[in-house]
Every structure is written in structure tokens, then in C-alpha cells.
Amino acid sequence: MTSTSILGRLWRSLAAGFLLVAIAGCDRAKPPEPVSLADIPRLLQEGFKDAKGPVKEAVTAVVTALEAQDWPKASLAIQSLSTQAGLKAAQQELVARCTMAINAQMAEAAAAGNEEAEQVRQVHRMEK
């Protein structure tokens, strides 16, 4: 084999590899859309209807905090839910969507002067 044919094969292999990576990247899903705050309790209860133990307790904590409009507590509770072991892919996506909506509301509360909401936001920033 000549160095030219080896080099040609190398370039073709690299081009094929690049093409595969590009194609795989094109199939990425869009980021999850947030849900409305009013829908979160129902969605969580439906999505976790068979949950037991700490997962069920975390869902209850989120729903209770939302009903009380306690945004800092809801944010901490949804974060706790997100760290529970054994969540299915659909449950993880639901939690991510709920987290976006809750944290957006908490940001509004912090901007309106809710000191506890601002403290929780600062903790979230430090954890990143």
C-alpha cells in the first residue's frame, strides 16, 4: 500500500465518522417545555400515581407547597424529587418541566421582594 492510499482511506474514514456524528446530533430532542403552575399538582399526581416511600413524600411536598404558593419550598421540594433514585424517563422529564415553571415563579417572587425566594435562588446558583 502506498502512503497516498492509506491517507485516502484515513480521510474517508474520518469523513464517514464526522457524518455519523452530525447525523446523530440532528436527532436531538428539543429541551422540555415548562408546564403551567396550575397543572403541576395534577400532572405530578398522575405521573407518580404508583410512587411509594420517599418519592411519594416528595411529590406530596411539592403539591402542598404549590397549593400554599410557597415558591421557595416548592422549589426545594421539586429539587428533592429530581434526586430520587429510580425515576423513569417520563417522570424525569415531567420533573424537569415542573422545575422550570416553579423556578420561574420563584424568580418573580424574589424580584418582588420575597427574601426567602432570593435566598433559595442564591443557593441554587452556588450549587451549579
What are these regions (language model features)?
Residues 60, 72, 96, 100-107:
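Generic structural signal for well-ordered, non-transmembrane alpha-helical segments
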Residues 78-103:
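Short, charge-rich amphipathic alpha-helical segments embedded
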Residues 26-30:
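Bacterial signal peptide processing site
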